Amino acid sequence: MLMVLLFQRLGIIMILAFLLVNNSYFRQLIEERSKRETVVLVIIFGLFVIISNITGIEIKGDRSLVERPFLTTISHSDSLANTRTLVITTASLVGGPLVGSIVGFIGGVHRFFQGSFSGSFYIVSSVLVGIVSGKIGDKLKENHLYPSTSQVILISIIAESIQMLFVGIFTGWELVKMIVIPMMILNSLGSTLFLAILKTYLSNESQLRAVQTRDVLELTRQTLPYLRQGLTPQSARSVCEIIKRHTNFDAVGLTDRSNVLAHIGVGHDHHIAGQPVKTDLSKSVIFDGEPRIAQDKAAISCPDHNCQLNSAIVVPLKINDKTVGALKMYFAGDKTMSEVEENLVLGLAQIFSGQLAMGITEEQNKLASMAEIKALQAQINPHFFFNAINTISALIRIDSDKARYALMQLSTFFRTSLQGGQDREVTLEQEKSHVDAYMNVEKLRFPDKYQLSYDISAPEKMKLPPFGLQVLVENAVRHAFKERKTDNHILVQIKPDGHYYCVSVSDNGQGISDTIIDKLGQETVAESKGTGTALVNLNNRLNLLYGSVSCLHFSSDKNGTKVWYRIPNRIREDEHENFNS
């Protein structure tokens, strides 16, 4: 009878656990153990442990069972069989020993007052269960987020054994004989089920993120050639067709700030390319630059009353934080936008904005009066881009977190590259961020192959030409070390030199032949891995910006190569100054 009643209580806890784990906010909480997350977890599991106490089964002094809906108080001579230890154990495994001990204290204190100020030992035993369960759980986790099923069962048995030991000492072993087996089974099964539900949700989320990242990368790969042409009706139509072909949306559209550029799918009869943007939803997104989701026709607000589009997500496309258009995805019929579609579209919009910025920068460079400077500043090595994309694609299958990290580093590299395409000079902080993003991607491709270090005695707001470090670091990565797999060191140094700063990049590579070194920076060379064009352009930019005193210098022997130049000792006063001449 006791076992049946306890399983009923377990069912209550499992229903609450399912509702809790189904909440995305709770799943986000358990990924970090900061003070804020700890407090929220304590509140949640504190409520659970109180519910466990008041839904328990009262055991009278004659060992008869009393079932009441809610046990607010019991006689000091009576005992209680409940799921308190189960909740404390689960709290410890999810939040660690700190959360487990506090939840145990809450449960023990509540049990003390529930028992008419008797059973103070429950406070000590419950706190001890929380600490021991949390410590053992942390020890067993190793590289996994949570212990395995067998380990959870072991922890549950240990936790319940601690509780039974206190009950036996302070209440009597006859009671322990009556409840120990049901409580052991209950605690082990409940903890296992709770963790299984949680791990299933987390695993599904991780797989979903990996699939989303893969989809975004595939669409990025296919749309790149079109978006770099800019937002034109032709490029927009090609992009919309690709998105429509690879997703389950019923309609896809692209606009500039005023007109529809392309609309593929349902609604193409009245959302016509070349005509003004019709829906209030799209107009508001373009106006304030904030993404919006509509789950019904009224929210879309299309003036055509026969429009079949029923839900939509509209995301702004931005270049340098200015909205230049909108990406629109629609469902028809009864389908609504889920979090999956929302994340996909937001990710696509960020990538598309970067691609548009790349294309516009290239076009502006062709028309700029300082084309020689602009051309180099806007260059993004296509081989580096596609190698990085392939690396990320490979990481998706084995480590989605590393794939997201690589994608963020690639995004940082593109952003700083595009900023360099707009500015004549950047701060040392910006250039160093560019170098770090480049090296982080390279290190993901070739773990442990390169070691980059800095020795800088200059303010972060010191100004230097865009790519003034990145070109030299990339040159070392591509040419200095040949096939050597390890012990490849690159050192970036910036030191005061009178009214100048001396900027140098050195490596411990295999050196440069005498026939080539005299040509570097002056003219292109015939080499299998490059022509030295980037060095020539950098040298020309240094001359144009600062004069011949700042030209590139090279020294090399069998122990490595050093490249250096000098720039005036001036600190940038306006961080947002753009070179628009």
From Swiss-Prot:
Gene3D superfamilies: 3.30.450.40, Histidine kinase-like ATPase, C-terminal domain
Its membrane topology: Multi-pass membrane protein
Short name of any one Pfam family annotated for the protein: His_kinase
Top-rank taxon, per record: Bacteria
Modified residues annotated as Phosphohistidine in this record: H383
Domain Histidine kinase: from-to ranges: 356-571
Catalytic activities: ATP + protein L-histidine = ADP + protein N-phospho-L-histidine
Transmembrane segments: 4-26, 38-57, 86-108, 115-137, 152-174, 179-198
GO molecular function, one term: phosphorelay sensor kinase activity
InterPro entries per UniProt: Bact_2-comp_sensor_kinase (IPR050640), GAF-like_dom_sf (IPR029016), HATPase_C_sf (IPR036890), Sig_transdc_His_kin_internal (IPR010559), Sig_transdc_His_kinase_LytS_TM (IPR011620)
Keywords: ATP-binding, Cell membrane, Kinase, Membrane, Nucleotide-binding, Phosphoprotein, Transferase, Transmembrane, Transmembrane helix, Two-component regulatory system
Subcellular locations according to the entry: Cell membrane
EC number of this enzyme: 2.7.13.3
Gene Ontology process terms (BP): cell wall organization
Residue ranges occupied by any GAF domain in the UniProt entry: 231-355
Main location class: membrane
PANTHER family: SENSOR HISTIDINE KINASE YPDA (PTHR34220:SF7)
Described function: Member of the two-component regulatory system LytR/LytS that probably regulates genes involved in cell wall metabolism.
The protein's name: Sensor protein LytS
Organism of origin: Streptococcus agalactiae serotype V (strain ATCC BAA-611 / 2603 V/R)
Name of the gene this protein is made from: lytS
